[in-house]
Amino acid sequence: MSQLDLNALNELPKVDRVLALAETNAQLETLTAEERVAWALENLPGEYVLSSSFGIQAAVSLHLVNQIRPDIPVILTDTGYLFPETYQFIDELTDKLKLNLKVYRAGESPAWQEARYGKLWEQGVEGIEKYNEINKVEPMNRALKELKAQTWFAGLRREQSGSRAHLPVLAIQRGVFKVLPIIDWDNRTVYQYLQKHGLKYHPLWDQGYLSVGDTHTTRKWEPGMAEEETRFFGLKRECGLHEG
């Protein structure tokens, strides 16, 4: 596998970009997660960033990437509506892993948004998408721009939802390379990694949460529910960061 030209790939239509990356992805599928990170750092352009929602299994990708690339900027888009346990988890992992945390927020405070738009998360799919655009997508776009990112690592896994089932290791999103080192990991592999490195699940894991986002759009798992049904009232899985 050789170095890839981001500018040249960005000039191609999306379908052609996927085809251009197909051979590289076929080879990346044969590598371990650690090897994928090392390959990306050697062959893809900097600056490098890692995004995290500090969700249930966030410690895995944070530890994995940070141990290979210490001080990599870790982007958190903070909506202001995270669980108290999430904010505590962020503090704990930032201290334990010595993370270079970069927090980005919407230009409007949560209270101001509610005054202007009402509770967007109660306004169906359209309201949720507007909420995500304001609180997730715009802050992430700003982060990528301000940090001059050209390669973005994230901890998505195919097993998490139908919308992620066919994602490749390497893609181009928002004009930058996006690398998903643990995309093919199952829950058992995640558990084994956490155990091996003395890491913890999010505190709400023990209370029956399989996925954690904002307090108003996250539900505990109940028998018969798919994991993706625990977010956004089952109306959608993605918050907008990993779409497009």
Swiss-Prot record:
Active site: 239
Recorded GO MF terms: phosphoadenylyl-sulfate reductase (thioredoxin) activity
Enzyme Commission number(s) of this protein: 1.8.4.8
Entry function: Catalyzes the formation of sulfite from phosphoadenosine 5'-phosphosulfate (PAPS) using thioredoxin as an electron donor.
Pfam family membership, one: PAPS_reduct
Organism: Salmonella heidelberg (strain SL476)
Pathway, per record: Sulfur metabolism; hydrogen sulfide biosynthesis; sulfite from sulfate: step 3/3
A GO CC annotation given for this chain: cytoplasm
Tree of life domain: Bacteria
Keyword tRNA processing among UniProt keywords: no
Gene name of the record: cysH
Protein name in the entry: Phosphoadenosine 5'-phosphosulfate reductase
Reactions listed under catalytic activity: [thioredoxin]-disulfide + sulfite + adenosine 3',5'-bisphosphate + 2 H(+) = [thioredoxin]-dithiol + 3'-phosphoadenylyl sulfate
Swiss-Prot/TrEMBL keywords: Cytoplasm, Oxidoreductase
Record-linked InterPro entries: PAPS/APS_Rdtase, PAPS_reduct_dom, PAPS_reductase_CysH, Rossmann-like_a/b/a_fold
